[in-house]
């Protein structure tokens, strides 16, 4: 595998998506021969079909999805194909990839065993995990679960990270007592935020109104950096699937020199040790106590913020990609031997 090899990317094309972070990182480390098959529309259609579960509609969908994918495969000379999630791909597509002898990688940013949301997983991915040369997963717990079920597949622990282009330090004065939370709505997050005694600025989609807090629209990267820079506290509230692990914001907040107050978890404590490079909580009561502690101890929290920023430097997507490519080299050697 060399830097002239053609690399295919399959996934969604949105500004804040993992796909674009990794494409930027590939370019940063001089892998410029990239072909991107974006699948926004068909992924959206597939998620709707999952709700109805009609086999005839799925057959029709598979016809169009396979046609699009075949054209992409035969038109290009791919050496590696990185699929982000790929829940909409059926078994026939994997046969085409195998025939072309393409090294196949999956970077899975969700829980493949979670069928609660139609956008999170599908029977397709569960059936076809064994077709991947490397299946990358962000959680150590999920990696163990996958390894116990699929004995012949290589599973690779690939945590989230931050984008050097998108997540940067913006020089803004901290607004005293500004608490921000940037993220999407879910019931657990809502209940937790409702219990916070101080006013929180919430940025994201689908949030109902609060008596005490201010709800703002979803923000993109430039605005994200500004909000983090202005906040005395940047909250990170882990969703159910991320408990005891981490999420994308785990690395993004420190990389933008934010002070992260986050749900207590084992993995986050490894990346950004509690009370040294982050502050953590388990309950609403503890969360309120930590907020007061931060407001009353600016010198201590300034050191925590600075330490976390320095520690974040080894967690860029450039670094993640170099680590993954090293393992892809090994697979390529085995294939050739």
Feature roles, as predicted:
Residues 82:
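N-terminal Rossmann-like NAD(P) cofactor-binding module of classical short-chain dehydrogenase/reductase
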Residues 94-101:
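Surface-exposed amphipathic alpha-helices with a cationic face
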Residues 106-118:
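A short, histidine- and acid-enriched strand-loop-helix "catalytic/donor-clamping" loop
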Residues 287, 300, 304, 317-324:
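Hydrophobic alpha-helical packing elements
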Residues 247, 278-284, 293-298:
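Conserved acidic donor-binding segment of nucleotide-sugar-dependent glycosyltransferases
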Residues 2-76, 85-92, 115-274:
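Nucleotide-sugar donor-binding catalytic core of glycosyltransferases
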Residues 293, 300-314:
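A short, well-ordered alpha-helix in the C-terminal region of glycosyltransferases
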Residues 317-337:
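C-terminal alpha-helical cap of glycosyltransferases
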């Amino acid at each position: 595998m060399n830097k002239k090899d053609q690399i295919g990317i399959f996934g969604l094309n949105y500004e804040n998506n993992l796909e674009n972070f990794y494409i930027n990182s590939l370019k940063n480390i001089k892998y410029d021969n990239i072909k991107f098959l974006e699948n926004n529309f068909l992924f959206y259609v597939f998620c709707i079909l999952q709700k109805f579960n009609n086999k005839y509609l799925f057959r029709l969908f598979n016809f169009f999805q396979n046609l699009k994918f075949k054209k992409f495969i035969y038109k290009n000379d791919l050496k590696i194909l990185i699929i982000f999630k790929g829940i909409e791909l059926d078994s026939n597509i994997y046969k085409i990839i195998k025939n072309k002898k393409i090294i196949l990688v999956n970077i899975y940013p969700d829980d493949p065993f979670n069928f609660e949301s139609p956008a999170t997983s599908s029977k397709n991915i569960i059936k076809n995990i064994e077709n991947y040369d490397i299946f990358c997963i962000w959680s150590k717990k999920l990696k163990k679960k996958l390894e116990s079920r699929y004995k012949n597949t290589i599973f690779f622990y690939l945590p989230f990270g931050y984008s050097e282009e998108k997540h940067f330090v913006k020089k803004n004065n901290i607004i005293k007592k500004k608490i921000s939370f940037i993220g999407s709505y879910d019931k657990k997050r809502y209940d937790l935020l409702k219990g916070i005694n101080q006013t929180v600025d919430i940025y994201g989609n689908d949030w109902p109104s609060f008596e005490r807090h201010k709800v703002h629209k979803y923000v993109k990267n430039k605005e994200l950096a500004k909000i983090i820079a202005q906040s005395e506290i940047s909250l990170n509230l882990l969703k159910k699937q991320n408990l005891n692990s981490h999420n994308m914001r785990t690395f993004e907040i420190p990389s933008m020199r934010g002070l992260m107050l986050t749900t207590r978890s084992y993995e986050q404590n490894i990346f950004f040790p509690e009370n040294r490079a982050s502050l953590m909580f388990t309950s609403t009561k503890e969360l309120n106590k930590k907020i007061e502690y931060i407001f009353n101890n600016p010198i201590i929290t300034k050191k925590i913020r600075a330490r976390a920023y320095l520690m974040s430097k080894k967690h860029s997507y450039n670094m993640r990609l170099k680590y993954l490519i090293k393992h892809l080299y090994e697979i390529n050697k085995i294939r050739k031997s």
